[in-house]
Amino acid sequence: MQLRLPHLQRSKSMAKPLPVSPLARPLPDLATIAGVRLSAVAAGIRYQGRTDLMLAEFVPGTVAAGVYTKNACPGAPVLWCREALTTPYARALLVNAGNANVFTGRAGIQACEDCADATAQLLDCPPQDVFLASTGVIGEKLPQDRIIAALPAARAGLEENGWADAARAIMTTDTFPKAARRDVKINGTPVRIQGIAKGSGMVAPDMATMLAYVATDAKLPQNVLQSLLASGCAQSFNSITVDSDTSTSDMLMIFATGLADNPEVDDVNDPALAEFTLALNDLLLELALMVVRDGEGATKLVRIAVTGADSNLSAHRIALCIANSPLVKTAIAGEDANWGRVVMAVGKSGEPADRDRLSVAIGGTWIAKDGGVVENYDEAPVVAHMKGQEIEIAVDLDLGDGQARVWTCDLTHGYIDINGSYRS
């Protein structure tokens, strides 16, 4: 296809190993998805002593859908995938860690073409049925020869139970692998949804340095898959932020093998899809929250709920403004219940707000109501809440029915330590 324009991790690019996040979650009991095989190998792209290349093979007839970064400087693999998605089918997914293949000009495009051609030859499929992703350092040419040389081993290692190894292979500054699973029914037919993700820094809507891949054995057409994924992404990966930086490489994809052979569903609003839709949304949110839990240097997960806004969009923007405020994030890191910084963030958002109708709560305790401090406010429960690992901030604007939820993490010196030495 011609392209139109939990462990300690050590790498060449980081002098010290990264400790596992205190907010880490263990891998769940992963199962298999009929029609999907995965493998992970060491291609030596950037890291030493670990796998850095994952390959997934899908049964013929697998349907794909995806959403990609809105960054104006996308990587070559993002452009490749957008083009590949103009046809509904997928036979392979190839993901490397350590090099983003971004801002590499014609060489980056050629690397995609070479990797897709080599994968297609091994799996006997058209190159346009091969989806590609790269994550890592920007501006360095992708050593595709190393990837291509590792492909035979990747093909030989393909297995149905390769999910956990695949999750580890795509990590960069991640400190733990991320995966989730759901078992549901469509019209009485059992179907399974399972996914993996990576992400730790450069995380902010629209999506981030975030890769997430979900597979299901459900039989669904591409238009339905695309609608489900876009809707689920809005409530999950587009509602998280670590550092407000939107990556050049992020993508979220779903692959449906159809082997569950459920009754055909060709309308996203069909009641038969209700259980599947809820499960997919829940799985996507679980994966997204794992990314926030693994935010670079993070020690606290923060949930920000905004209600009473002029519209849902306005509520979302206000929540993100709070979540991205360095003053709010550092106060949380210092366990300081400095609610005035929340008020500041609301006011600077550019969205409709009335100081005299604004209310703020932390940990379920209302601190300010209707533009003033609550009478006889007792800070003790708020101080106790700030010492926990999961912080809740609520804001009510009392202007309308708009509401939104956004998740972020605190901002510690660990973020500087990791990013100050990322390439050294």
Curated annotation (Swiss-Prot):
UniProt-annotated location(s): Cytoplasm
SUPFAM superfamilies (alphabetical): DmpA/ArgJ-like
Superkingdom in the source lineage: Bacteria
Site (Cleavage): A208, T209
A single GO BP: L-arginine biosynthetic process
Molecular function (Gene Ontology), one example: L-glutamate N-acetyltransferase activity
Catalytic machinery residues: T209 (nucleophile)
Entry's EC annotation: 2.3.1.35, 2.3.1.1
Family of the protein in this entry: Belongs to the ArgJ family.
Entries under PANTHER family matching the protein: ARGININE BIOSYNTHESIS BIFUNCTIONAL PROTEIN ARGJ, ARGININE BIOSYNTHESIS BIFUNCTIONAL PROTEIN ARGJ, MITOCHONDRIAL
NCBIfam families for this protein: ArgJ (TIGR00120), PRK05388.1 (NF003802)
Role according to the record: Catalyzes two activities which are involved in the cyclic version of arginine biosynthesis: the synthesis of N-acetylglutamate from glutamate and acetyl-CoA as the acetyl donor, and of ornithine by transacetylation between N(2)-acetylornithine and glutamate.
The name this protein goes by in its record: Arginine biosynthesis bifunctional protein ArgJ
Gene source species: Gluconobacter oxydans (strain 621H) (Gluconobacter suboxydans)
Lineage start: Bacteria, Pseudomonadati, Pseudomonadota, Alphaproteobacteria, Acetobacterales
